[in-house]
Amino acid sequence: MTDKIRSVQGRVVSDKMEKSFVVAIERKVKHPLYGKFIRRTTKLHVHDENNEAKLGDLVEVRECRPISKTKSWTLVRVVEKAVIA
C-alpha cells in the first residue's frame, strides 16, 4: 500500500492560538457553465509545536493523524516570512 502524504502551501491568516494556526489554501476552479476561473479558499487548522509561523507567512503543511477535532495537519517549514510594512 503506497499512500502519498498530502502536502500543500498556503498563507497564515490567524496565529492567535497556542501551538496552532490557521492557513488559507487558495485554488482556482473553472465555472461549470461560463468557464471563468474562480478563486476558492480552504481554511485548515495546523499544528505548530514551536510557534514558528507568524501572520502572513507562506508555509508548507502536510497531512497527519488527527491531533484534535479540527487539526489534522502539521507544519513542515516556513517557505517565506511575511514582510512587515
Curated annotation (Swiss-Prot):
<comment type="similarity">
    <text>Belongs to the universal ribosomal protein uS17 family.</text>
</comment>
<keyword id="KW-0689">Ribosomal protein</keyword>
<dbReference type="GO" id="GO:0019843">
    <property type="term" value="F:rRNA binding"/>
</dbReference>
<keyword id="KW-0687">Ribonucleoprotein</keyword>
<dbReference type="GO" id="GO:0003735">
    <property type="term" value="F:structural constituent of ribosome"/>
</dbReference>
<keyword id="KW-0694">RNA-binding</keyword>
<comment type="subunit">
    <text>Part of the 30S ribosomal subunit.</text>
</comment>
<dbReference type="InterPro" id="IPR000266">
    <property type="entry name" value="Ribosomal_uS17"/>
</dbReference>
<dbReference type="GO" id="GO:0022627">
    <property type="term" value="C:cytosolic small ribosomal subunit"/>
</dbReference>
<dbReference type="Pfam" id="PF00366">
    <property type="entry name" value="Ribosomal_S17"/>
</dbReference>
<protein>
    <recommendedName>
        <fullName>Small ribosomal subunit protein uS17</fullName>
    </recommendedName>
</protein>
<dbReference type="InterPro" id="IPR019979">
    <property type="entry name" value="Ribosomal_uS17_CS"/>
</dbReference>
<dbReference type="InterPro" id="IPR012340">
    <property type="entry name" value="NA-bd_OB-fold"/>
</dbReference>
<dbReference type="InterPro" id="IPR019984">
    <property type="entry name" value="Ribosomal_uS17_bact/chlr"/>
</dbReference>
<keyword id="KW-0699">rRNA-binding</keyword>
<dbReference type="GO" id="GO:0006412">
    <property type="term" value="P:translation"/>
</dbReference>
<comment type="function">
    <text>One of the primary rRNA binding proteins, it binds specifically to the 5'-end of 16S ribosomal RNA.</text>
</comment>
